[in-house]
Amino acid sequence: AMAAEANTISVRGIAKQEVAPDMAYLTLGISVKGDTAESVRTQVAEVSQKVRRALLGMAISENNIQSSSYNLYPDYENVNGKNKQKGYALNTTLRIKVDDLKKLGDIIDKTVQEGVTNVNQVSFALSEESNVHRQLLAAAVDNARAKAAIVANAGGRNLGEMLSADISDYNGETMVAAGTNYKRSLAADVAAPTQLMPGTLKIDASVE
């Protein structure tokens, strides 16, 4: 074992690439308050239905529209130093997969017009990320082999076969616009259209 360890070289190969995203995940929030639990449930149901209709009208598939949370709770106010329940509040979120980034700004504007109160998160991604990652892994192996060859040649040895590989995680998603709040008003009708600049995704892979 000692001899085998003495004849091994441990190196780390790295490969990186920046790519333009071609899809996004959009998390929309609907928040309402009312006197009764039934009233807030009704309000949210009506807004959710309008938002879904708007999304379907923009060619967003039903399969790409998912409810991700639904929280109903008492709404309190402070009266003379004491908390007094004045009604109920309900928050729900929808997670939307957007395959056409050109539609992203219009989707946000249209759903806000239909009652969405929060854009909680926008994350950009690459539909073919797994293919890019496989290419980067191969490049990382080549990078590691080149480093090992330099060390072996410097020591007067020939490089043999790779004995083991430890693959690290990689990151290929970027998030923007977390916690953006929207208030419906007359001014919103003349506001400039929402524009988001996705930039590039940094994907990396390493082999050790």
Predicted regions and their residues:
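Short, charge-dense linear interaction motifs
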Residues: 1-114, 118-208
